[in-house]
Swiss-Prot record:
The lineage of its organism: Eukaryota, Fungi, Dikarya, Basidiomycota, Ustilaginomycotina. This is Guanyl-specific ribonuclease U1. Belongs to the ribonuclease N1/T1 family. The keyword Lyase applies. One of its GO terms (molecular function) is ribonuclease T1 activity. The keyword Oxidoreductase does not apply. Disulfide bonds join C8-C103, C51-C87. Keywords: Disulfide bond, Endonuclease, Hydrolase, Lyase, Nuclease, Pyrrolidone carboxylic acid. It catalyses: [RNA] containing guanosine + H2O = an [RNA fragment]-3'-guanosine-3'-phosphate + a 5'-hydroxy-ribonucleotide-3'-[RNA fragment].
Length: 105
């Protein structure tokens, strides 16, 4: 998965936290939360530096356990649904309505 840290609208996530989110998503143990789910990339972000998709998204959290339910917050990791490769990170912070903007990484 590599070590990619991201900054989503001023919230910093270490590569460990990013990888934890992907691992939680792949485990399926929190699927009752509705995540992970397909990310269709309606915004047209370019994730090709990291992967080609198809994409899934999962909430990013700073807590040691990562997202395990409840409010998903504004930030998401996007990963390749075939192999779990990190693709990118997106956030509702700074976007209009329910849209996303890309995080920096």
């Amino acid at each position: 998965q590599g070590g990619v840290s991201v900054n989503c609208g001023g919230t910093y996530y270490s590569s460990t936290q990013v990888n934890r989110a992907i691992n939680n998503a792949k485990s399926g143990q929190y699927s009752s939360t509705g995540y992970p789910h397909t990310y269709n990339n309606y915004e047209g972000f370019d994730f090709s530096d990291y992967c080609d998709g198809p994409y899934k998204e999962y909430p990013l959290k700073t807590s040691s356990s990562g997202y395990t339910g409840g409010s998903p917050g504004a930030d998401r990791v996007v990963y390749d649904s075939n192999d779990g490769t990190f693709c990118g990170a997106i956030t509702h912070t700074g976007a209009s309505g329910n849209n996303f903007v890309q995080c920096s990484y």
